Regions:
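Short beta->alpha transition motifs characteristic of CBS
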Residues: 30-37, 48, 119-120, 171
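Terminal peptide-recognition signature
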Residues: 9, 18-22, 26-31, 46-47, ...
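PDZ domains, with a preference for the canonical peptide-binding region formed by the helix
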Residues: 104-106, 117-153
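PDZ/PDZ-like groove recognition
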Residues: 8, 12, 57, 61-124
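C-terminal, low-ordered peptide segments at domain boundaries
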Residues: 83, 126-127, 134, 141, ...
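Flexible, gly/ser-rich surface segments that form the specificity/activation loops bordering the active-site cleft
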Residues: 1-2, 33-44, 55-64, 178-183
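Short beta-strand segments
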Residues: 5, 44, 163-167
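Active-site region of chymotrypsin-like
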Residues: 1-40, 89-97
Length: 183
């Protein structure tokens, strides 16, 4: 299962009414969906970047989903953690605390790397990236914008040295689950 961006809207979408277009200013901006079985008068939509990703993905007749870079992170908001990893007060980023074997990150990133940017966007200590002035999304949204086969550039700090690395999204995230869906 993917954890993708959704937008809360001020239109009620009750059970069974998902799937229609969401229109704003005369343009389709997403697809209406219901996210909770027991919610009423709360609507959500799947925004166009996720829909565009899906449409590009299925051009070859199959849906592969979203890539997974192969690492897990921990926030760097705790001052003691920042001291332990020698992160300066003016530096932001997240700590790579797990690297999956045979993943895009395997052999490129290491546990203890501080990931400071994704595709040139600064990652905050809580794992968010500013996408509009004063508005933040989880850094994984920038991963989700990429198709399988794309390369994602990360800025990291390893052993107090800044580095640039690139990870090729070569496997869907579902391949890294311990139990595969629908089994």
């Amino acid at each position: 299962d993917e954890n993708l961006i959704a937008v809360q809207i001020d239109a009620a979408i009750n059970f069974g009414n998902s799937g229609g277009p969401v229109i704003s200013g005369g343009k389709v901006v997403g697809v209406a969906m219901q996210s909770g079985f027991f919610t009423e008068n709360i609507g959500y939509m799947i925004p166009t970047p996720i829909i565009q990703h899906f449409l590009k993905d299925v051009e070859d007749g199959k849906s592969e989903g979203f890539g997974f870079p192969g690492f897990l992170v921990q926030s760097m908001e705790n001052p003691a953690m920042r001291r332990k990893y020698s992160v300066e007060d003016d530096q932001t980023g997240v700590l790579a605390h797990k690297i999956y074997p045979n993943s895009p990150a395997d052999g490129i990133m290491k546990v203890g790397d501080i990931i400071t940017k994704i595709d040139g966007h600064a990652i905050q200590n809580n794992g968010t990236v500013e996408f509009r002035p004063g508005e933040y999304l989880n850094y994984t949204h920038w991963i989700d914008l990429h198709q399988l086969g794309d390369e994602i550039k990360f800025s990291i700090i390893r052993d107090d040295q800044p580095m640039e690395v690139a990870l090729k999204m070569n496997r869907p995230g579902k391949e890294f689950l311990l139990v595969q869906p629908n089994q």
